[in-house]
Structures are given as C-alpha cells and as structure tokens.
C-alpha cells in the first residue's frame, strides 16, 4: 500500500500528528536531507582543516555548507508536503532542485515577515513616545500598556504560526504573497487550533529526538572508550598526518567522524518538525478559501502597482 492509499484510508483524520513517523519511512526525504547534511558536514570539516592556510576557505566552504543544508531541508520539505497531500513522489534529484529553487521564495517570505513584525515594534515605540508627554502621559500609559502587551502577544502568536506554515505553503506551490496571505487568514481564523497542533507535534518530535540523540550519544561514548586505549590520546591538527594516516591526527579523523554521525542523526530527526509544518499547513489551508484569498491578494498587488506607476 503506497502513501496515497494510506492517506485515503485515513479520511477521518488525514493530517493527524500521529502521521509523523511516516516522515522517517519516506526514503526520498531521508535521502535528500541526509545527503545535504552529510555534504554540508564534510564541507564544514574541510573548511576547518584548511583554516590554517587561509581564512577564506572556512568562510566560503561554511557558506556553501549552509546553502546546501537549507536547500536540502527545503527539498525534504517539498517531499513531505507531497507525502502529506498523498501525491505521487518525484525523484530525489527533482526534490533537490525544487529545494534549491525554493530558497529565494523562503528568504523573501522571511524578510517580509521580519519587516511586518518590525513595523509592529515601531508602532509600539511610537505609542510609547506619545505616552512620554508630560501631564497626560502617565494617564495614557494606563490604557496603552495593556493594549500594547496584547498587540505584541498577538503579533508573536501570528509570527510563530506563520513561520511554521509559510515554508510548507511555498513547498506546496504557493507564491510568496499568496503563502503569506493564506497564513494570515489561518492565523486570524484558527490561531489556537493551529498553534495547538504545532506545539503537540513539536513535543512528539522532541521526545523522539531525545531518544535518538541519547542512543547516538551513549554509542559514541562506548566507541570512544574503546578507541582511547587502542589509538591513544592526542589531538594534533596536522593535515598531512591526517591524510597520511599516522600520528595523533587519528583523533582528528575520529572527531570528524563523530561530527558526521551527529550531523546525519540531526538530518534524520529534523524531518519530524518539517512533517509537523506540512501537516499543519495541509489541514488548515483546507479550512480557508484559498482561491478567494489568492484573488484578493492579486487584486491588492495590482492596485499597489498601479499607484506606484502613477508616481
């Protein structure tokens, strides 16, 4: 039974958080995430080893590693969104390309959300500036402080929900402004339902992550305990010795190996919060009229463009 058939068999709760383990059995997402994180880890390790030659190498390789990790995360997110929707899987390479091409949209959406939240904080600062007036200022603060606290709290709630579902919206094929508008509609109409699902999913993800990292950590200690008397102690950062396989640089190689183990485990575990976002998006985007929201957003953008053109 493929994932589409499993989804059809769960029509009552097609986007339940108890579908989280499906993310770990989706080998396409595991492959995309694991390959990107493993490659990023190798690039980071290579950059640290070349740091003694020039500071340029760790900077460039670190930046490339960051892009690779984010692109892989995005590609895995596209795959998990397909899984949540019950759509047929694409190829692993297709998900890698989709993740890479999603990066500009994700960056744009992130910047717009930061600007919106910054605008809220600027508004709060302006109100407080008005309340600084002598005489009437203290009276205004009596009313302003509760309203400002409520405003910032609602902004934080909306920002938290939006951050969790805007990415999956983009992975689902939505344009940036459409994704933000739909996320705003979900936040406005289903704030506590959405945040409850997100928090519940993240708690389950955290429990599983603790189990995985606990197992990996204990296993690493056992291997390290066996390696210490066999290999010996020492951490000489000698690149030629590491490549040549002699001297205490064995421990440098072991350190790189441990880093790769934890990077790979992280890639595996991080699939779960991605699945939480995908399931939340799929459930609540079906509860709003996406077509009407898209049309209203396009109309508003056309009005803005027309007014800008007049100047």
Language-model features, listed with the residues they occupy:
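Catalytic cores of eukaryotic secretory-pathway lumenal/extracellular enzymes that build
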Residues: 97, 150-151
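Long, hydrophobic alpha/beta structural blocks
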Residues: 170-171
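Short, charged/polar low-complexity linear motifs in solvent-exposed/disordered segments
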Residues: 49, 124-126, 212-214
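Membrane-interfacial helix-loop-helix connectors in multipass membrane proteins
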Residues: 126-150, 220-247
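Helix-coil boundary and N-terminal low-complexity module in membrane systems
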Residues: 1-123, 157-164, 174-202, 206, ...
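Extended amphipathic alpha-helical segments with heptad-repeat/coiled-coil character used for oligomerization
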Residues: 151-154, 210-214
């Amino acid at each position: 039974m493929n994932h589409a058939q499993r989804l059809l068999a769960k029509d009552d709760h097609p986007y339940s958080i108890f579908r989280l383990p499906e993310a770990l059995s989706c080998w396409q997402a595991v492959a995309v995430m694991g390959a990107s994180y493993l490659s990023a880890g190798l690039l980071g390790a290579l950059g640290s080893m070349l740091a003694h030659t020039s500071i340029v190498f760790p900077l460039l390789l670190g930046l490339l590693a960051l892009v690779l990790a984010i692109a892989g995360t995005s590609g895995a997110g596209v795959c998990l969104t397909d899984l949540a929707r019950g759509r047929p899987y694409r190829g692993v390479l297709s998900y890698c390309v989709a993740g890479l091409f999603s990066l500009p949209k994700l960056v744009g959406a992130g910047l717009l959300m930061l600007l919106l939240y910054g605008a809220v904080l600027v508004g709060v600062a302006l109100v407080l500036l008005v309340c600084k007036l002598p005489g009437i200022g203290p009276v205004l603060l009596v009313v302003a402080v509760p309203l400002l606290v409520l405003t910032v709290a609602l902004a934080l709630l909306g920002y938290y929900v939006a951050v969790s579902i805007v990415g999956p919206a983009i992975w689902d094929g939505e344009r940036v402004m459409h994704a933000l508008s739909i996320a705003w509609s979900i936040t406005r109409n289903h704030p506590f339902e959405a945040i409850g699902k997100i928090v519940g999913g993240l708690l389950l993800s955290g429990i599983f992550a603790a189990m995985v990292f606990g197992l990996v950590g204990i296993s690493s200690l056992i291997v390290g305990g066996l390696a210490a008397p066999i290999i010996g102690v020492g951490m000489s950062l000698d690149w030629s010795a590491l490549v040549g396989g002699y001297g205490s640089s064995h421990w440098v190689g072991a350190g790189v190996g441990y880093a790769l183990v934890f990077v790979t485990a992280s890639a595996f575990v991080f699939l779960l919060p991605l699945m939480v976002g995908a399931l939340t998006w799929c459930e609540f985007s079906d509860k709003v009229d996406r077509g009407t929201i898209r049309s209203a957003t396009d109309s508003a953008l056309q009005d803005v463009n027309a007014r800008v053109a007049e100047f």
